């Protein structure tokens, strides 16, 4: 990855550049999308790379006892995944989710081992914050919430029921959306479900996220603050819900003062809720959403207005077919692949402009979890893999799956009391890291179309959904 992108949080933001409020959508990105502003382009890519971290670090091997976990500790996550701005951010909290397997097929993966770390929970994302050096250079302390998308192929779309449910449980008393605003059941269950059987899901992913963000807002209340929620595919839906939740429940309010800006920057997002949810979202004065959509990608059309859904926020539409580096005849999953979208953003010069990379970004990243690049680029398909798929030769001469080092073992989240320990707080303030329901009516209206258009090979890897 392009390590120079790390300067986004320092020299590229501030004097002579777009101020943070504009980047976070204070003016709804008017004049910044066409042509695409360079600093906004870098911010979008940074958010996309934060999403990619969730794919690159997730253990999806069902043979492993630790399937469903993050492979790395909070203190090493960004470095081990070669995140380009690792020196500017510190990971403050991990998020874990649970859900009924029938609510969202493919969203959770579990170990086949009897000694599995958990049979109920999956790692679903993380909360990070800019450190002192980056905050001082940019004049803005930014809290990032990154949500993981699905690991399975796009076949989930064919079996997922697009039922709409109310989300009154997360709306404050007296909120005008109570009983009217509805979101897809699958997204909502992953976001809000708990399972007492698992120490990782005694609190919902929502509760874990709110506790972490609330703590960071309180810690940095005297600084210029912003919150960015980001995700791809399923993660985009969770990020949109998350941003809305932070605002309507007052987590973005600093004491008795004004609300800080909260922005969802999402990629390849399915539709989240009904027109009332859209209305309630867009009426919040400090809440924005920017959806980066690849035009040939079909997922953002799902479930569709025919089933009672509406798009939320502003859309930056790009078209990967303009890139000379990628295949023209490819599977639908490639158009939805996160790295394919980020590659297109890096070279996007408008629908009438010629594709030309505007920032230094390796073309090889496109094939990180796909075969989207033309063979003439000489980049192997799906090249981001664990060495020997995690197999090691033991002293007894037997090959076996290697477990994580002690510092990388999953640790249950703490939500009550002080949720960010002193070591992690020190990391956040240092430029060098230390150790850290009501169901609506579903519909099969789209099933025939989906059968035809989303027939994705089983070889679809992480980042394709």
Swiss-Prot record:
Active site per UniProt: 233 (acyl-ester intermediate), 233 (charge relay system), 297 (charge relay system), 336 (charge relay system)
GO terms (BP aspect): cellular response to UV-B; lipid catabolic process; UV protection
Biological role stated in the UniProt entry: Acylhydrolase that catalyzes the hydrolysis of phospholipids at the sn-1 position.
Name by which UniProt lists this protein: Phospholipase A1-II 5
Keyword Hydrolase: yes
InterPro entries: AB_hydrolase_fold, Fungal_lipase-type, PLA
GO cellular component terms, A-Z: cytoplasm
Species this chain originates from: Oryza sativa subsp. japonica
Enzyme kind, highest EC tier: hydrolase
Pfam families recorded: Lipase_3
EC number, as in UniProt: 3.1.1.-
PANTHER family given in the database record: PHOSPHOLIPASE A1-IIDELTA, PHOSPHOLIPASE A1-IIGAMMA
A molecular function (GO) term: phospholipase A1 activity
UniProt keyword terms in alphabetical order: Cytoplasm, Hydrolase, Lipid degradation, Lipid metabolism
Compartments where found: Cytoplasm
Protein family according to the UniProt entry: Belongs to the AB hydrolase superfamily. Lipase family.
């Amino acid at each position: 990855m392009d390590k120079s992108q790390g300067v986004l949080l320092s020299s590229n933001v501030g004097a002579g550049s777009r101020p943070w409020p504009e980047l976070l959508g204070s003016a709804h990105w008017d004049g910044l999308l066409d042509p695409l502003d360079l600093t906004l382009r870098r911010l979008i890519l940074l958010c996309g790379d934060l999403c990619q971290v969730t794919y690159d670090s997730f253990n999806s091997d069902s043979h492993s006892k630790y399937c469903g976990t993050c492979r790395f500790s909070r203190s090493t996550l960004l470095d081990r995944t070669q995140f380009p701005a690792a020196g500017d951010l510190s990971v403050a909290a991990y998020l874990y989710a649970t859900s009924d397997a029938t609510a969202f097929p493919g969203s959770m993966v579990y170990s086949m081992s009897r000694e599995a770390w958990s049979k109920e929970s999956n790692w679903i994302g993380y909360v990070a914050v800019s450190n002192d050096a980056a905050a001082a250079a940019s004049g803005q302390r930014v809290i990032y919430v990154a949500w993981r998308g699905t690991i399975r192929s796009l076949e989930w779309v064919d079996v997922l029921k697009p039922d709409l449910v109310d989300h009154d449980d997360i709306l404050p008393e007296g909120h005008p959306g109570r009983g009217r605003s509805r979101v897809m059941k699958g997204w909502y269950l992953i976001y809000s479900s708990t399972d007492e059987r698992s120490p990782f899901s005694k609190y919902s992913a929502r509760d874990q996220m709110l506790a972490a963000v609330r703590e960071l807002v309180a810690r940095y209340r005297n600084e210029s603050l912003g919150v960015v929620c980001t995700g791809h595919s399923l993660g985009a839906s969770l990020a949109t819900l998350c941003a809305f939740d932070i605002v309507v429940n007052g987590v973005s309010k600093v004491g008795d003062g004004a609300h800080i800006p909260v922005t969802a920057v999402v990629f390849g997002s399915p539709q989240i809720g009904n027109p009332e949810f859209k209305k309630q979202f867009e009426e919040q004065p400090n809440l924005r959403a920017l959806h980066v959509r690849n035009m040939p990608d079909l997922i953002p059309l799902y479930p569709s207005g025919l089933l009672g859904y509406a798009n939320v926020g502003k859309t930056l539409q790009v078209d990967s077919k303009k890139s000379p580096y990628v295949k023209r005849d490819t599977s639908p999953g490639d158009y939805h692949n996160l790295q394919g979208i980020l590659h297109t953003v890096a070279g996007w010069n408008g629908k009438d402009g010629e594709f030309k990379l505007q920032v230094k970004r390796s073309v090889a990243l496109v094939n990180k979890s796909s075969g989207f690049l033309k063979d003439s680029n000489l980049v192997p398909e799906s090249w981001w893999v664990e060495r020997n798929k995690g197999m090691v030769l033991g002293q007894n001469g037997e090959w076996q799956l290697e477990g994580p080092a002690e510092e990388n073992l999953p640790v249950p989240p703490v939500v009550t009391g002080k949720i960010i320990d002193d070591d992690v707080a020190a990391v956040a303030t240092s430029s060098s890291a230390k150790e850290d329901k009501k169901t609506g009516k579903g519909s099969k209206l789209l099933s025939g179309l989906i059968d035809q258009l989303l027939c994705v090979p089983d070889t679809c890897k992480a980042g394709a959904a």
